[in-house]
Amino acid sequence: TDWISFHNRSSMSSAGVTMIAERCDDSYWEKNYDGYTLEVLKKLPPAKKRIIFINIDGSHYTYIARVPVNLRDKLGISKEDPYHDYDLTIAYDDQVMKDIFEYAKANLNLKSMIYFSDHGENMKHYHTTSPFYYDMVHIPFFVYLSPDYQAAHPELMPALKSHEQQVFTNDLAFDTVTGIWQAKTNFYQSQYDFSSKDYAINMDNATTFERKKKIKDDPVWQGK
């Protein structure tokens, strides 16, 4: 198991994540742009089986500082975009994810890839507990399963596709990831696993922010 992180290893906000990371076989703490992930992947020693966790820096403020200077004018983001700096980080990390995916498929015998954010962002208040805005919990989420992994676990892809339009929050990451990877524990609950036919989260019962906020109250879902 390998952990690759572009966050501060010793900050208070990263303490919990650091404790988990240090339990991996190897951990790599990088002070570089997210695109450097490829260089770290290329240095990993050969292994028959491997799980790699990658904790990229993403779209944290100050946004412009997250993107290499030589790429800032090459990512297709208009200078007239009112959220130029933030959107630049999105475009940059889209490219980073593409590069990681293509490298892993070509060189690491990629069986599955799961990506999600820990939070979204409000352009005025960033991400915080007070005040709370729903765009702070809008996150990207995607799952890739290789053809042979799908063949070995034929129940996964139909379940994932059937839930494509349903609610997912990263509170459900534990059950979903362990379900996809067939690493279920005594704590696993299939009703919270997005890849299970038993998935039971919907607009009526989905919550976020320590169950204090109902997803159905999000203005996006209400068409506002």
Where are the predicted features?
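Active-site-proximal alpha/beta segments of enzymes that process anionic O-linked groups
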Residues: 1-73, 169-170, 175-200
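Short, solvent-exposed loop/turn segments at the edges of secondary structure
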Residues: 21, 136-138
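A long, amphipathic alpha-helix that forms part
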Residues: 38-46, 71-116, 124, 143, ...
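Active-site neighborhoods of enzymes that stabilize oxyanions during catalysis
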Residues: 58, 131, 139
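Histidine-centered active-site/metal-ligand motif
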Residues: 60-61, 119, 125-130
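Flexible internal linker/loop segments at domain or repeat junctions
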Residues: 68-81, 149-158
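Membrane-interface soluble catalytic domains
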Residues: 102-107, 123, 130-132, 147-224
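SF2 helicase/translocase ATPase core recognition
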Residues: 139-145
